[in-house]
From Swiss-Prot:
Pfam families: GATase_6, SIS. It is an enzyme of class 2 (transferase). It catalyses: D-fructose 6-phosphate + L-glutamine = D-glucosamine 6-phosphate + L-glutamate. Its EC number is 2.6.1.16. Homodimer. GO terms for cellular component: cytosol. Residues 2-226 form the Glutamine amidotransferase type-2 domain. Its main location: cytoplasm. PROSITE patterns: GATASE_TYPE_2 (PS51278), SIS (PS51464). This is Glutamine--fructose-6-phosphate aminotransferase [isomerizing]. It comes from the Bacteria.
Length: 624
């Protein structure tokens, strides 16, 4: 999500850091900033909300002493805690103005740490989780067993933090030193000649060096102009072979921005394990599901007697999946509406209605107007959004942010999986408030969600045959997608992706409707992709869809079946079988969607189209 750069060496750090931030603009951001260690033992911090040009204007006004120091940090922020404002932009510094930090990720236990610091008299200058880290390091550096030892102070604080994070610190009292660390979120080191770099990715330093190290899990590094020392969070540097990865960068800058992938969309598909994991982070605290911005009490949620979900495009498909989960867990009736239709049909809304509005950008015009219509009718409105501080969350009663990070590809991929995850969290929050799930049941469902990132990664690791399959069907005039239950919205999403990216005719159908018309389309060599339900979830649905597969195969179609590992009953009827791990019924879309994303992208590539920028489409639709 956020872009991080750190530099220590012989060159003026300001110029190096600002150039690095420009190279990392592709990551997306809502604010940016720099911390510069001056030659006179002081620290200068400059930060601005909005475009990087705003920061460049501010930096141009800095005194000459701030422009000549040779140690500095830079940051582009994608907001998670606190709105995208100047005061919440990074870097953050301690009260003495000596120590600065930049941060990517989430500190899950920040609320308790902040309370502890405030009890000690520390005053906070922002609404972020990040600021607790710099105040804790400042305390450790000035008092106690690590006093005067910058690196040891950082390590002592790291051991207290929960969550997924990358943290990079600079200290005006030790101007030639940077201390950085990572847990789960990426961090790479660039090894130069008399200079060292650290960044979120190699774009931070690729013009300066091609020699790099990827830090391992729960590792820290101390950087000086002369070299580096890597340790675990306990300070041990005897880490053994393979603890971190040394590599040479062969990519050019354009490839580095895409992480070595040909297109941003392919990179974003690969980022889906992190998108799901980050969306879950911090939402289960003391045995309860919590939202990011909760202005609805449990009593107000108990008063809800019906739910509407409003969204457009891919977000609408995630809303269809929300219906299955919310109805199953809460026994509340749920209607899913296209936002563009919702306010024009005079839906029945009142104070007992909860409207869930899903939007990646938070600016989707149809969804925004649906939110305003719901508010006019006194309904309660909850937003699921990927962009902190955008318009839709500002107008809602509660917010749950998907933390998928910036999505450059126009066709949504990682935000779709993050939206499904967020929808399920909303369902569990409602069940918890209404008492339709016992606390241990809510906890069990949450932990099942927590296991999904690893399973998503497993699917991604075995997906190559899908790309090869796409080559065979790249020139097909049409492709049909079939599913039942939660497989039906997945079929709709698969068809949409193929239409968006490959400009092919594709349709998704509920398999039970096959005999009511779509079977007339079946002919020789027509590719039909089937999302098979788990035989353990519903034996009846499984048997019925198996019957559908036999019907279409008997009419000459080519069957491409996505089924759970070990489902041998489907094998005789699948011309091509794509296997995914076995999970509970509601969680299957988080896995079965991935082959369809890869299939659509691969077909588009085979047809010679730009996967990132499909024709006639925009990432954020801000007009009706």
């Amino acid at each position: 999500m956020c872009g991080i750069v750190g530099y220590v060496g012989q060159q003026p750090a300001c110029a190096v850091v600002m150039a690095a931030l420009r190279r990392m603009e592709y990551r997306g951001y809502d604010s940016s900033g720099v911390a510069l260690v001056n030659g006179d033992g002081t620290l200068t911090v400059s930060r601005r909300a909005g475009r990087l040009a705003n920061l460049e204007e501010a930096v141009a006004q800095l005194p000459p002493s701030a422009l000549t120091g040779t140690t500095g940090l830079g940051h582009t922020r994608w907001a998670t805690h606190g709105r995208p404002t100047d005061r919440n932009a990074h870097p953050h510094r301690d009260a003495a103005g000596k120590i600065a930090v930049v941060h990517n990720g989430i500190i899950e236990n920040y609320a308790g740490l902040r309370h502890e610091l405030e009890a000690d008299g520390v005053e906070f200058a922002s609404d972020t989780d990040t600021e607790v880290a710099v105040h804790l390091v400042a305390q450790a550096y000035r008092h106690g067993p690590t006093a005067g030892d910058f690196a040891a102070s950082v390590l002592a604080v790291l051991r207290r933090l929960d969550g997924h994070f990358t943290l990079v610190f600079a200290n005006a009292d030790e101007p030639g030193t940077i201390v950085a660390a990572r847990r789960s979120t990426p961090l790479v080191i660039g090894i130069g000649d008399g200079e060292m770099f650290v960044g979120s990715d190699v774009a931070a330093f690729i013009p300066h060096t091609r020699n790099a190290i990827e830090l391992g899990q729960d590792q820290a590094v101390v950087l000086t102009a002369d070299g580096y020392r890597i340790t675990d969070f306990d300070g041990n540097d005897d880490l053994g072979p393979g603890a971190y990865r040394e590599f040479h960068i062969d990519w050019d800058l354009a490839a580095a921005e895409k992480g070595g992938y040909e297109y941003f969309m392919l990179k974003e598909i690969a980022e889906q394990p992190a998108a799901v994991a980050d969306t879950l982070l911090g939402h289960f605290v003391d045995g309860r599901i919590v939202l990011d911005e909760q202005r609805l009490s449990d009593q107000e949620l108990r008063e809800v007697d019906k739910v509407f979900v409003v969204a457009c495009g891919t977000a609408y498909h995630s809303g269809l999946l929300a219906k299955y989960a919310i109805e199953h867990w809460t026994r509340l009736p749920v209607e899913v509406e296209l936002a563009s239709e919702f306010r024009y049909r005079d839906p029945v809304l009142d104070r007992s209605t909860l409207v869930v509005a899903i939007s990646q950008s938070g600016e989707t015009a149809d969804t925004l107007e649906a939110v305003r219509h719901a508010k006019e009718q006194k309904a309660k409105v909850l937003a699921i959004c990927n962009t902190n501080g955008s318009q839709i969350p500002r107008e809602c009663d509660a917010v749950l942010y998907t933390r998928a990070g910036p999505e450059i590809g126009v066709a949504s991929t990682k935000t779709f999986l993050a939206q499904i995850t967020a929808n399920y969290l909303v369902g569990l929050a409602l069940a918890q408030a209404r008492g339709t799930k016992y606390p241990d049941e809510v906890e069990r469902e949450y932990h099942e969600l927590e296991a999904m990132p690893d399973l998503v990664a497993r699917v991604l690791a075995t997906i190559k045959p899908v790309a090869a399959l796409a080559q065979r069907f790249a020139q097909s005039p049409t492709v049909l997608f079939l599913g039942r239950h939660v497989g039906y919205p997945v079929a709709l999403e698969g068809a949409l992706k193929l239409k968006e990216l490959a400009y092919m005719h594709a349709e998704g159908f509920a398999a039970g409707e096959l005999k009511h018309g779509p079977i007339a389309l079946i002919e020789d060599d027509l590719p039909v992709i089937v999302i098979m339900p788990s035989p353990k979830g519903s034996a009846v649905l499984h048997a019925k869809l198996l019957s559908n597969i036999r019907e279409i195969q008997a009419r000459g179609a080519i069957t491409i079946v996505i089924a759970e590992e070990g489902d041998d009953t489907v094998r005789p009827y699948a011309d091509h079988l794509i296997e995914i791990p076995s999970v509970s019924t509601l969680l299957q879309p988080l896995l079965s969607t991935i082959p369809l994303q890869v299939f659509a992208a691969s077909v588009a590539q085979a047809r010679g189209y730009d996967v990132d920028k499909p024709r006639n489409l925009a990432k954020s639709v801000t007009v009706e």
